[in-house]
Amino acid sequence: GIDPNYRTSKPVVGDHSGHKIYGPVESPKVLGVHGTIVGVDFDLCIADGSCITACPVNVFQWYETPGHPASEKKADPVNEQACIFCMACVNVCPVAAIDVKPP
């Protein structure tokens, strides 16, 4: 699953749709973790969509990631500021790719 310490153990290597990207990133095979409040490990995400369905405040949007070995799209936490910390996404993710931490 996602490393719950990624916010301090991984360097910030970029910014995407208003949230940080934690590296390393070597596109298209290694995409890192997207988000700080709601972190999605893009290298674990298999795009089954359960988090998108479960989230009551629409934190996630699909993001195309052609060429990634796990899946060709990811659940991107573009609206992480809207998170109400219900943990529905964490609880339904089949590969434990999501970590939520209030700011």
Curated annotation (Swiss-Prot):
Q: Which InterPro entries match?
A: 4Fe4S_Fe-S-bd, 4Fe4S_Fe_S_CS, Fd_Zn-bd, Fe-S_Ferredoxin
Q: What does this protein do?
A: Ferredoxins are iron-sulfur proteins that transfer electrons in a wide variety of metabolic reactions.
Instruction: Provide the residue span(s) of the region labelled N-terminal extension.
Output: 1-36
The entry's protein name is Zinc-containing ferredoxin
What region holds the 4Fe-4S ferredoxin-type domain? 35-65, 74-103
Pfam families in the record: Fer4_10
**PANTHER family this protein is in?**
ADENYLYLSULFATE REDUCTASE, BETA SUBUNIT, L-ASPARTATE SEMIALDEHYDE SULFURTRANSFERASE IRON-SULFUR SUBUNIT
Cofactor requirements of the protein: [3Fe-4S] cluster; [4Fe-4S] cluster; Zn(2+)
- Gene symbol of the encoding locus: zfx
Can you quote the record's cofactor note?
Binds 1 [3Fe-4S] cluster.
Q: Where does Zn(2+) bind?
A: 19, 34, 76
PROSITE patterns, A to Z: 4FE4S_FER_1, 4FE4S_FER_2
Q: Which GO terms describe its molecular function?
A: 3 iron, 4 sulfur cluster binding; 4 iron, 4 sulfur cluster binding; electron transfer activity; oxidoreductase activity; zinc ion binding
Query: Which positions does UniProt annotate for [4Fe-4S] cluster binding?
Result: 55, 83, 86, 89
Listed binding positions for [3Fe-4S] cluster are: 45, 51, 93
On this chain, the residues bearing N6-methyllysine are: 29
| Keywords linked to the UniProt accession | 3Fe-4S, 4Fe-4S, Electron transport, Iron, Iron-sulfur, Metal-binding, Methylation, Repeat, Transport, Zinc
